[in-house]
């Protein structure tokens, strides 16, 4: 039986509540302050695990109590998850950290069936939740001897006036290489009855991004974990589990030429993945996180229908926003292309017109969290026609994929 931890968050007036403040997510011009206070349901004197499997948080929104129910995302890491960086002389240094007792959660708001939440509890509470159609973010205020957190709407993050950020995939663009279909094996009745798919994702961080975060590998690692936790949450409605298989940080130099032409860089990364990375550790798809500025306002690109192909199961994502939620939305979009999804609206304005869906060609504001019906149909067509075999394999841990939590479930 899983013990439940109840935490009451008390709202309080902060001296500069409502004024602008600089947070990790950016400059925020309107926010509320909350003070988390734990009220444990465990018996007095019982030993509490560092991070409980199930937690509840209660806060007040417009004077009404809101109950946030969270469950640990046990599917976040693969059993063989590894982290690699490089010594000054270029030697690979690989570790296999213990990640079973991690601090990343998904959840729902009680009595709000359309709600979602993706939260890190590693150092305070950080992440987002969707309540009554509105996206809120929460993160700790870095104050000495204080448990204060800021809660704010995404729309209250100050943004620069700039051209729309675009995906580099166009309607007619395809790789010069055909995608091999040799892995179209027979599906067992069990696989047909249980259509869950599992993507073991490899994340590679380029040298520019390493410099951007002041050569702090730990900070980058936490950011990537938060990012993939968000991506995993957004793929749940499609019954796709995104599992982080490996994290590699190019901490001395880039191992390919990362240039502003996104499609050239994507091709180079695909070659490197096929000839180097795939031979070192098993995974299904690899994405390169970079701090380079691509031409034509491109912030991401991936091969359409490339999933499971040795060279084409790759994508590029620019770490262009300090808000990890925004970058996670870009990664979710590019993974959609890997899984056979087209843009919701093509160059002729046809197909699904959905400016607030994940596969819109331009990133929406706030970033979309839902796939359109067209995207779901594209994905199902890809599964039927291409039969990507690699994503049929469930992770080895028996507790990897947890049951989604309904917003209407009794707590």
Curated annotation (Swiss-Prot):
It is an enzyme of class 3 (hydrolase). GO terms for molecular function: metal ion binding; metalloendopeptidase activity; toxin activity. Pfam families: Pep_M12B_propep, Reprolysin. GO terms for cellular component: extracellular region; plasma membrane. Coiled coil: none annotated. Its EC number is 3.4.24.-. CDD domains: ZnMc_adamalysin_II_like (cd04269). Ca(2+) binds at residues 284, 390, 393. Residues 197-395 form the Peptidase M12B domain. Belongs to the venom metalloproteinase (M12B) family. P-II subfamily. Snake venom metalloproteinase that impairs hemostasis in the envenomed animal. This is Zinc metalloproteinase/disintegrin. It comes from Protobothrops mucrosquamatus.
